[in-house]
Each structure stands twice: as structure tokens, then as C-alpha cells.
């Protein structure tokens, strides 16, 4: 997937080599800057951009896990468009559905800019901001991206979360498993994934107990207890695990290190993306 997306981007940039005027690439990341799987893509794109003549680039992290209200969403959106008001991008790479939710304002303010949208789902909720912690998003009516294909100049690349295949593998590799724990934060995508996992377990493994452990200051000890335990009756499925807490100055501080215990865990840990495990953390 990474190779294909880099090829598409490189192909799109080829005419720039002959252009005399510098053009601009903007990457808007829904997640935070330390998200492992996203950073893997971003790093490669920035390398390609740096090696492309007449192409400047910039990067914005929306930090979706901190955006739980309309007012915060609107503030971040306003800051993005104000920042590039006099320096409009010629190309866009959008990671995640929160970034893609900016598409109407992108078209209105920046024109019909070519967009590469990278996400885990090929469906969206119209007029949805994908606020973290919003329970409505998971059950809202969705449309396929093909339904809006003619309205926007975008190419979609899916980075799938293979939850069904991963759960099947967990059952095979941990035959004594009686309980599955999905450990994640409350990003909109994880809230939707929680519902999908519950439905799949009900259908395929109705005797398997299920717990969705949501990242927070209060659940920190819970996940640490699971990680240091060798109890084979409990299977751990790792999603992204970020949350905020007040800093010494009273401002929200993003907590990212709880999953560093993975490296010393005596139990097998399963993940929806390999980069979670390579970094000892998650998106």
C-alpha cells in the first residue's frame, strides 16, 4: 500500500520537475504526530517531496484525540485555513476522515486541489466532523466514497484494519482464550471498530467474553495489569491508545507512553497494524 501511494504521488509530481514556479504540498494528518503507522507514510512522502525539484511542503497535525467538541473542531479548522490563506497548497494528502471532512472548505477556499485521501474506511458520514468520543458517529448512516467521487478531486487509498482476520488468528493462537480485550482510545474510528468487533464476536464467537478498555487516566492501571499478566485466558487486541490529562500548567497534555510495557509483556499482544508493535505504542 505504501509503495502504491508513493508511486501515485511521484507520478503526480513529475510535471513539477519542468516547472519554473515552485508549488506546494500540504499534508493534513487527523491524528497526532507520533502515530506510528501514519508517521511511516508521512516520512516517505516528505523524502519524496524533498527530492522533487520545485516542490515545497508543509505538515499539519489535527490531534483528533483532543477534539471532542464542535468549538474545538471549528477552532482547529479556522487555524488551518488562516495559516495557509496566502500560501494555498497545490496538492493535498489527507490522513483520516477528520482531515477529509475539510473537503468542502478546501474546495471553496483553495479550489479543486488534487487530494490523496488515506484512511481505514471507504465510507463516510456526510457533514460529520468525527469528533473523539462522539457515540453517534458509529451508528450514523454512511455513504460510500464512490457516491461523492464526482464532487471532489480525490484519490482514495485504504489502509484496512483487519479486525476479523486478527480475531480469527487470536482464537487459533490462544486456544484457552475466554475473553477478548480491545484496548483503544475513543477516536471516532475506534468507536466504530468497537461496534464491528462486538457484532463479529456475537456472530462467530458467541461464548467469548468481550471488553472494550478505553484509554484514560483511570484505565491506565487496567491496561498495565493486562500487559504484565501471563493469563492465557485473556487476549489483548491493541488499537491506538492516547488520552489527555492536565499538565502542571493546567493545559491538556497528550499521554502516549502507556503501551511501552509491550516490550516486556509475557503474553502475546495482537494489533491491527504492525507499526503499533514496532514502536511499542499505537496511533
Task: Describe these PLM feature segments.
Residues 2-12:
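Bacterial N-terminal signal peptides
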Amino acid at each position: 500500500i505504501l509503495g502504491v501511494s508513493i508511486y501515485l504521488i511521484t507520478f503526480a509530481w513529475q510535471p513539477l520537475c519542468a516547472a519554473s514556479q515552485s508549488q506546494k504540498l500540504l499534508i493534513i494528518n487527523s491524528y497526532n504526530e507520533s502515530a506510528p503507522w501514519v508517521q511511516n507514510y508521512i516520512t516517505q512522502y516528505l523524502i519524496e517531496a524533498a527530492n522533487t525539484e520545485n516542490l515545497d511542503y508543509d505538515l499539519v497535525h489535527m490531534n483528533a484525540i483532543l477534539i471532542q467538541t464542535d468549538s474545538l473542531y471549528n477552532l482547529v479548522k479556522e487555524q488551518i485555513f488562516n495559516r495557509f490563506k496566502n500560501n494555498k497548497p497545490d496538492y493535498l494528502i489527507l490522513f483520516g476522515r477528520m482531515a477529509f471532512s475539510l473537503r468542502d472548505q478546501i474546495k471553496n477556499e483553495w479550489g479543486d486541489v488534487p487530494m490523496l485521501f488515506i484512511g481505514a474506511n471507504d465510507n463516510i458520514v456526510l457533514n460529520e466532523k468525527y469528533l473523539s468520543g462522539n457515540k453517534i458517529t458509529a451508528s450514523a448512516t454512511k455513504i460510500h466514497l464512490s457516491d461523492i467521487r464526482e464532487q471532489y478531486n480525490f484519490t482514495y487509498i485504504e489502509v484496512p484494519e483487519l479486525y476479523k482476520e486478527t480475531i480469527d488468528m487470536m482464537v487459533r493462537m490462544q486456544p484457552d482464550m475466554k475473553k477478548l480485550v480491545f484496548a483503544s482510545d475513543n477516536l471516532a474510528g475506534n468507536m466504530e471498530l468497537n461496534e464491528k468487533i462486538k457484532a463479529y464476536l456475537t456472530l462467530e464467537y458467541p461464548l467469548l467474553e468481550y471488553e472494550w478498555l478505553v484509554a484514560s487516566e483511570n484505565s491506565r492501571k487496567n491496561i498495565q495489569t493486562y500487559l504484565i499478566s501471563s493469563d492465557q485466558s485473556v487476549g489483548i487486541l491493541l488499537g491506538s491508545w492516547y488520552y489527555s490529562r492536565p499538565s502542571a500548567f493546567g493545559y491538556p497534555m497528550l499521554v502516549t507512553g502507556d503501551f511501552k510495557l509491550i516490550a516486556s509483556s509475557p503474553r502475546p499482544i495482537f494489533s491491527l497494524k504492525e507499526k503499533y508493535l514496532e514502536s511499542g505504542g499505537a496511533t
